[in-house]
């Protein structure tokens, strides 16, 4: 399975084309829209979310609620485009109009300046429009298709916020994926411990008044994953590496870890490694899950536990200093519509990205043209693993 996305933040629409989804997967626009609503929610979201009410249109690859095995095309209209029709026009317009909303004061931490240098733009809006987090709308849409496939294989996935603005959430031990999903869904900031809810929301309000932004850390957990996804035989076939690439490809994400992650650097091997057990009923298991469900770049049957860190949003309402690319004079950076934080919403994006990587690897290992064949292949593999 592979996909491409297209579209600008203030253009007419966003598009994704997905290839390789087996025929016979139940899929509806309502299911995708529910995921898009999750992305638009979360405490701390700003004005753009009041303008946009994302609704997907499926224009190919699905008929009568079932995928057809052909490329799936998803479109989401940008409602705000009506205010940007000339500014974002594909057709040439007069120079006077081109100067409207021209961006020449790049924002520190954003793609504005480097994108302008790379593609030789005199108007840095060209960098801003495609590099905007608005593109994550389609990452969620694509991820919802992947999640639908995982559900059919009884693979569950959930995400929650574990750190927001430096405030750490006390996460109860041994929560199931279903419990994480339920608890996070009841929180405006996607935390599983309500004791932190008001403290974090108050801090978000404070940050907004300051004209500042905050980042955080998100954890995604996947249960029911078959043993042996990924491979050790080549570097690029290691599944944890593929997930790491996917997570860090999300706008503003700067790091990723699995299981104990960076704590491994402070611990002894006798503590970190997960001891192996065997029983006739369950086959091979691990006593712990310090490695986050991976050994040798392959899934080992334990839940996948992956965390990603998101930096604070670079657009500040009290902007930092920058330089005008036309005059080379120091100026405060440009201000675009922004939020004090998007970490809760980014949890939905990360969940979709991890689901997409997993679905892709499943289809690589259990290559199937239709869902019936796929389910049979996975079931046969699971039987072999249990009897190994």
Swiss-Prot record:
GO terms for cellular component: cytosol. NADP(+) binds at residues 39, 45. Its EC number is 4.2.3.5. Pfam families: Chorismate_synt. Reduced FMN (FMNH(2)). GO terms for molecular function: chorismate synthase activity; FMN binding. It catalyses: 5-O-(1-carboxyvinyl)-3-phosphoshikimate = chorismate + phosphate. FMN binds at residues 130-132, 251-252, 296, 311-315, 337. Signal peptide: none annotated. Belongs to the chorismate synthase family. This reaction introduces a second double bond into the aromatic ring system. Homotetramer. This is Chorismate synthase. The gene is aroC.
């Amino acid at each position: 399975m592979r996909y491409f996305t297209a579209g600008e933040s203030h253009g007419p629409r966003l598009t994704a084309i997905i290839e390789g989804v087996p025929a016979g997967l139940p899929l509806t626009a309502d299911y995708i829209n529910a995921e898009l609503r999750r992305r638009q929610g979360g405490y701390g979201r700003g004005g753009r979310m009041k303008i946009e009410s994302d609704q997907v249109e499926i224009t190919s690859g699905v008929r009568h609620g079932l995928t057809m095995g052909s490329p799936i095309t998803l479109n989401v209209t940008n409602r705000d485009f009506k205010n940007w029709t000339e500014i974002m026009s594909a057709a040439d317009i007069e120079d006077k109009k081109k100067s409207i909303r021209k961006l020449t004061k790049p924002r520190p931490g954003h793609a504005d300046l480097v994108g302008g240098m790379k593609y030789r733009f005199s108007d840095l809006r060209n960098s801003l429009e495609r590099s905007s987090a608005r593109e994550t709308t389609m990452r969620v849409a694509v991820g919802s298709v992947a999640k639908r496939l995982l559900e059919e294989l009884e693979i569950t996935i959930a995400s929650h916020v574990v750190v927001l603005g430096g405030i750490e959430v006390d996460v109860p031990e041994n929560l199931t994926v279903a419990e994480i999903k339920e608890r996070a869904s009841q929180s405006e900031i996607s935390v599983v411990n309500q004791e932190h809810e008001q403290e974090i929301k108050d801090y978000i309000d404070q940050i907004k008044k300051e004209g500042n932004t905050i980042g955080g850390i998100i954890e995604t957990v996947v249960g029911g994953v078959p043993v042996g996804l990924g491979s050790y035989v080549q570097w690029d076939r290691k599944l944890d590496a593929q997930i790491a690439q996917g997570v860090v490809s999300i706008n503003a994400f700067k790091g990723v870890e699995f299981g104990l992650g960076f704590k491994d650097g402070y611990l002894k091997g006798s503590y970190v490694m997960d001891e192996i057990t065997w029983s006739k009923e369950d086959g091979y298991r691990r006593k712990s899950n310090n490695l986050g469900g991976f050994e040798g770049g392959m899934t080992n049957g334990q839940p996948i536990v992956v965390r990603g860190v998101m930096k604070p949003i670079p657009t500040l309402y009290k902007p930092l200093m920058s330089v005008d690319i036309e005059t080379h004079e120091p100026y405060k950076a440009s201000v675009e519509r922004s939020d004090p934080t998007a970490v809760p919403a980014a949890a939905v994006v990360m969940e979709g990205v991890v689901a997409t990587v997993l679905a892709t690897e499943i289809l690589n290992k259990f290559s199937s043209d239709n869902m019936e064949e796929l389910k049979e292949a996975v079931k046969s593999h699971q039987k072999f693993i249990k009897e190994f």
